[in-house]
Amino acid sequence: MATRLTKDLSRRDFLKFSALASAGALIDFRSSSEANLLKLFEQSKTDLLGRVFKDGTPSYSEPSAKGQQIALHNYNDVLGLKDAVILKTDHPVNEVWYRLEDKSFINSYDFQPVENQLNAPQSEIVSSGMLAEITVPFTDAWSSSTNGKKSNQIFYFGSTHWVFGLGEDEAKNLYYLVKEDRFNNTYYVNATHMRIIQDEELLPLSELIPLDGKHIRISLRQQMMVAYEKNEPVLMSALASGQLTGSTDLTTPVGNFAINYKRPSRHMVHSDRMGDNGTELYGVPWVSYFTETGIAFHGTYWHNNFTRPHSHGCINLPIPAAHWVFRWTQPHVPPREQKFVSQFGTQVEVI
């Protein structure tokens, strides 16, 4: 059984690429030589904003918890970013820190890189629904569109949701009518905070490669996945697999599997194999299931703790990586399909 994800990367370079991947970058071996990948690593930068995950999150004078504490930040604070700093250490902690605009540093574990992109609302929405993503750090999901409306939920950057209509409130603000996919509850969301995902963004990748020409290998020890075409690595990403929490074993199962079921958006609850305890997660993006018990690849907006076990069994990925896996693997999902089931999917090896 292989113990290395790729045959060409040294341990030192693997650590470098792992750190870059944990910052949300995808390592595409097809378009980059090793030298170019190293250059990409050294020049890597983050988005311009970041969202804080929890109250009391500290920033420091240097990229280390041993530095002077500069400030404490609260849940959903949105902070300006300058760049990412990759620590060249070999101990099992997150190696990525973000430098803030005030020149202090915050650990990437506590912080989601986000954007603040406003969008022109799309007036024509097909009756079967259209997939959309949140493009601002977070936005309210209202239970009604009238005066005295109450915010029931918050939707977060990168989450995906099904839109079924465009409306207007008393103040002439445009909103999308969103129906979540588990209980069919209806929410009203500022239409400028969502971007309708175009059909071409859902088309399959490398579709000429036959089913037996693709596979994904997951290393639980290295907390990395590599996708292969005809046994050549084509893409690498950091991940967060299932964890052992006290006497409860939520670790990701080892073995050989196949992707058999996909959803581009899923409302996950405590009965699912999700990432946080006692939490409901709305609009989990790009879900590709590969076991009968519901273990899946999916995008992650509620933590940024890649390269360490963190989930209830699923393979948590940076959102761009989960989107890539969703498109690259079989079965291919037609645009505007809310779910798709097939027993003939891409092979997944977990070691």
Give the label of every model feature segment.
Residues 1-13, 35:
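N-terminal secretory signal peptides
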Residues 11-25:
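N-terminal export leaders
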Residues 24, 34-63, 72-75, 114-148, ...:
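SH3-family beta-barrel domains
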Residues 36-43, 99-132, 180-211:
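Boundary regions of SH3-family modules and the immediately adjacent low-complexity/disordered segments
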Residues 73-111, 156-192:
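SH3/SH3-like beta-barrel superfamily modules
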Residues 167-254:
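Cell wall/extracellular polymer interaction/catalysis modules
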